[in-house]
Amino acid sequence: MGAVDTQKELSVYESMAARFDIAARKLGLDEGLYKYLRMPNREIIVHIPVVMDSGRLDVFDGFRVQHSIARGPSKGGIRFGPDVTLDEIRGLAAEMTWKCAVVNIPFGGAKGGVICDPHQLSQGELERITRRYTAEILDYIGPERDVPAPDMNTNEQTMAWIMDTYSMHARHTVNAVVTGKPVELGGSRGRREATGRGLLFVVNERLADIMIASFNDVVKYADGHNVDTRTAAYMLAIDRVAYDTRMRGIYA
């Protein structure tokens, strides 16, 4: 199993591969399975011709990487950005495979992207880019193949354009071709807040651990210094503020 030079800054894919190599060694993964899982199942590169509002024809590069379909259709977002790269998309697609597997969701991992600056594009230009990108990857996506979703600089509107374009080619409405679409088109309520809500759950659990640890520290401090717990809490807080202030002075 290959090793990665840790002296240089790793790309997104190299970082994923380095972590995968560590996990593979710990699991004693079969060499053949290791090779199969380390590389994506399919990489699609498209060149998207779009007529801009000025009448000028421009061409944008787009990608869709399907890392694994071993556990079901691949699943992953589509991102727009000037710094999008195939390497990044490749690494993020693999991470989607691991995320779905670790919580036992029957999907594989995928990711897509278009190199463009959405902040410099009009709504009409974004729509034309999205629809043409969808048409270019049409044969590789679908409810039973690969299901896109919003990601960086894409949203419900982007998914609505993808769904509409796919449905026009299918000659019937296909709601399940994307997730993250508007509720009016069959999207899930609460999807927009889902990531933030998940973060809230994690923070709540972590805060509970911190509060228990802090309470135990107060009790120990009170017992060791022969003071009541309220005084101990104040004294610990003062010590902590003094320590943080000193650290800022040292490292500022």
Model segments located where?
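Flexible, glycine/charged-enriched surface loops at secondary-structure junctions
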Residues: 30-36, 104, 141-150, 172-176, ...
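Short, Gly/Pro- and small/polar-rich lid/capping loops
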Residues: 3-47
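Adenosine-phosphate binding glycine-rich loop
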Residues: 3-11, 208-252
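Predominant activation on well-ordered alpha-helical scaffold segments within soluble catalytic domains
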Residues: 21, 86, 90-94, 127-138, ...
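N-terminal cap/recognition module
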Residues: 56-97
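Glycine/serine-rich phosphate-binding loop and adjoining beta1-alpha1 elements at the start
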Residues: 81, 101-206
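Short beta-strand elements
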Residues: 46-52, 58-67, 163-166
